[in-house]
């Protein structure tokens, strides 16, 4: 299931970088000025109650650093996807639950950066995200040459209790346990325990994995049902990943701070 990146895949990495560069040159003036292209919105403007923990805008991710294009820690989505998320948030409120997003729209340049990172020698600094795998095996089934995130129709998220407790700050120097460990041993997160951390490259992160506890399985099922009820589709290898609507054109505009 997990295979090393082949020579054609390496060529795809170069193509992604070229596409990202061309997209940047053709980027609408509004995006360059700090606005958003037509059809895209800041989730905070549609559903301000949804918590945001934008992992690729900081160091708490499997690359250990902010990703290109994440100039602000803001969730950006196609309007229809954002409005559907707002409905999920309202549905969950009756159970004293809410959503927390980890990633939304992802510039194409960030997808290219993932692939370049995978080909570099492994220094083990972020091994907690892939405890059982060789770094070169990470992207089969997880991160493709083309991501629905770049189309603005995919979102990575989890459940939080309401009111959500404050999360302890992430310490990049700390020796956190692997993403498959008990929640108390993993990097801090104020979400409900879903059995693994976000971006955990392991079979245990598969939505229907049978080794998680009954409570963890119930929470995953609850999240999937709530999202499905508003038109989202779950990716079976990642309990946190959902997409909405038809495929769209991939984008590369940077995520800038809201005006």
Give the predicted meaning of each segment.
Residues 5-20:
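Bacterial N-terminal signal peptides that target proteins for export
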Residues 17-29:
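Bacterial N-terminal signal peptides
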Residues 32-104, 108-129, 133-236, 247-259:
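Extracytoplasmic cell-surface/polysaccharide-interacting catalytic and binding patches
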Residues 239:
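Active-site lining segments that contact anionic ligands and/or coordinate catalytic metals
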Residues 242:
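Conserved metal-phosphate-binding beta-hairpin within the catalytic cores
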């Amino acid at each position: 299931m997990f295979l090393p990146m082949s020579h054609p895949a390496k060529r795809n990495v170069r193509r992604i970088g070229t596409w990202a560069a061309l997209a940047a040159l053709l980027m609408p003036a509004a995006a360059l000025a700090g606005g958003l292209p037509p059809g895209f919105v800041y989730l905070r403007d549609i559903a301000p109650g949804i918590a945001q923990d934008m992992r690729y805008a900081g160091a708490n991710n499997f690359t250990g650093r902010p990703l290109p294009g994440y100039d602000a820690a803001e969730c950006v989505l196609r309007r229809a996807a954002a409005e559907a998320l707002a409905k999920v948030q309202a549905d969950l409120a009756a159970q004293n639950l809410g959503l927390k997003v980890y990633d939304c729209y992802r510039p194409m340049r960030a997808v290219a950066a993932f692939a370049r990172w995978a080909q570099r020698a492994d220094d083990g600094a972020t091994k907690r995200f892939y405890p059982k795998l060789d770094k070169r095996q990470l992207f089969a089934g997880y991160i493709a040459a083309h991501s629905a995130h770049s189309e603005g129709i995919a979102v990575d998220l989890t459940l939080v209790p309401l009111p959500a407790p404050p999360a302890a700050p992430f310490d990049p120097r700390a020796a956190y346990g692997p993403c498959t460990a008990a929640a108390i041993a993993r990097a801090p997160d104020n979400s409900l325990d879903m059995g693994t951390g976000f971006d955990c490259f392991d079979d245990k992160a598969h939505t229907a994995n049978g080794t998680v506890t009954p409570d963890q399985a119930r929470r995953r099922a609850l999240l999937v049902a709530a999202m499905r009820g508003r038109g989202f589709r779950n990716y079976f290898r990642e309990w946190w990943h959902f997409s909405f609507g038809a495929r769209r054109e991939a984008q590369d505009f940077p995520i800038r701070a809201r005006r």
